[in-house]
Amino acid sequence: MPECMDKYKNDFAIEFAKIMQENLPQWKTLQKKHINALWKGEKLFWYIGCFLFAYLPGKRELNYDLNFHIFMSIMIVIFGIIIVFFCENKDYQNEIKKSLFPKLLKVFGKDIEYVAGSDFYELSNKVNYRSGYISHSIYDNSMLFNKPVSYDSPDDIFSGTFKNCPFIISETNITNVKRYNNGKSDSFTLFNGIAMLFKMQKKIKSHVLIYSKGLFKNKVPKDFEKVEFEYEKFNKKYDVYVQKSQMEARGQIEARYLFNTAFMDRFMQLHTSFKISKMKCSIYKGSMLVLLATNKDLFELNNMFYRIDDMNQYKKLFDEFASVFSFLEVLNLSSKTGL
């Protein structure tokens, strides 16, 4: 973790403990309620239904195998319990986060807000650094996807201003839906992970794309040319492309103006902080969109069978929050001159 975040660590721990102490009784009641809900009411009928369903004979089943159906009934019930636990636990965590995160984030700045994914559809369909919504047009104009965005399903959304830089951070799943004339459709996952939108004061006219290198070559849009830097450590991990313009050298010049050694070091630092495999970025019209691909569920608390007052939770949360805010702090995106 960068040293620039050390000044927040102690205040974060104190605030976490304070909020925990104030809310612990009601959170324990909430925890007990969700645990009990696993075995009561409609959930119980769901398990019984799953159990009995497995005993139904198949259409082409000639010889009824009781042992097989007993095995299947047990497996289906286990699967049903897992589904119910996942849904119930998610509801429990979201309720805790709604009361914890808004207060906890004030450690980093008074203007930072949190919105749970369950409240996402109450937001307007516009980019707004206060409402915390990244519109589909921003994703599409970034040119980081080869298909248009049809849906995005955020889990956690953070927005506001940090170090004079407006930002939106959205843990989300982005999907493209292809519809056919017969009424059928196919869904394609375009992205799963953390999307971060930052407003930059430094203006560049060119469109710049950054891709982390992997086993397969990145698919780059037409009319983009590669930019090579003298920093070999960065070149080994990333490919940078700039959109060609009528002024042939302008894109290359602007990319080199933006990508000084400090910028490249900090960009690599963000990649390693979240321990993700793929990362891509679009810099366009005064905004920077960073996509960190990961299947890990970030910004999460302990599940409902663990202690709510486990103070070790704050360490994980602090590391994840600090990784993002340190990126803003060290990149100095609010600067109009240097990075």
What are these regions (language model features)?
Residues 30-33, 37, 72, 88, ...:
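Amphipathic coiled-coil alpha-helices
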Residues 102, 106-108, 118-176, 184-339:
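Charged, low-complexity intrinsically disordered regions
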Residues 45, 58-77:
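Hydrophobic alpha-helical transmembrane segments
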Residues 50-55, 75-82:
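Hydrophobic core of alpha-helical transmembrane segments in multi-pass integral membrane proteins
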Residues 79-104:
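Transmembrane-cytosolic junction motif
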Residues 1-41:
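Cytosolic juxtamembrane N-terminal segments of multi-pass membrane proteins
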Residues 180:
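A surface/extracellular/periplasmic glyco- and lipid-processing/surface-interacting theme
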Residues 36-52:
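Transmembrane alpha-helical segments and their cytosolic interface motifs
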